[in-house]
């Protein structure tokens, strides 16, 4: 499959909708690890639940709890509510075509003012730009770095290597 995102062209071997959110989760983890190299950003399999692993979200950075999902529902909104009640700031990252759904769910549940909801594509693209500027790299080199980290995370935590991404 060939897709174009705001960071460049890539090939993803997994079919759209078949990853169960694992692609999205590992891409955010790779982005966070690349953005914060001094931190150890945990790498859990995509099926590992937050409660079972004692996490407040898929990723925790200081007082921020990141939740990553391919299909937002009331369950992730409830997790965001619990984060806010515990004085953590929830950030919900979803595919761009799910952004409005996530925002409507947050509004319906009355927490839209206490959660940041971002499109995955924008989240990654903004960080590609910021990291590139900070380190004096071109955007493609930074994207290569993030995808390299993503593929490392897939190899470490998943059994389905079809989830790996190849930059073209």
Segments (PLM) and residue ranges:
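Catalytic core segments in nucleotide and nucleic-acid processing enzymes
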Residues: 15-168
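Interdomain/boundary linker segments immediately adjacent to catalytic/signaling cores
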Residues: 1-22
């Amino acid at each position: 499959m060939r897709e174009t995102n705001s960071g460049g062209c890539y090939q993803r071997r997994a079919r759209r909708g078949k990853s169960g959110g694992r692609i999205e989760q590992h891409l955010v983890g790779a982005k966070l690890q690349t953005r914060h190299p001094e931190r150890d950003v945990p790498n859990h399999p995509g099926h590992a639940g937050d409660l079972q692993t004692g996490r407040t979200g898929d990723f925790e950075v200081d007082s921020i709890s990141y939740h990553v999902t391919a299909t937002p529902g009331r369950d992730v909104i409830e997790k965001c509510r619990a984060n806010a009640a515990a004085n953590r700031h929830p950030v919900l990252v979803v595919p761009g075509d799910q952004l409005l759904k996530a925002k409507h769910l947050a509004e319906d549940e009355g927490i839209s003012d206490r959660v940041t909801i971002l499109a995955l594509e924008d989240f990654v693209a903004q960080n590609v730009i910021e990291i590139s500027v900070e380190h004096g790299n071109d955007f493609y080199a930074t994207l290569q770095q993030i995808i390299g980290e993503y593929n490392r995370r897939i190899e470490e935590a998943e059994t389905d290597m079809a989830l790996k991404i190849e930059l073209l």
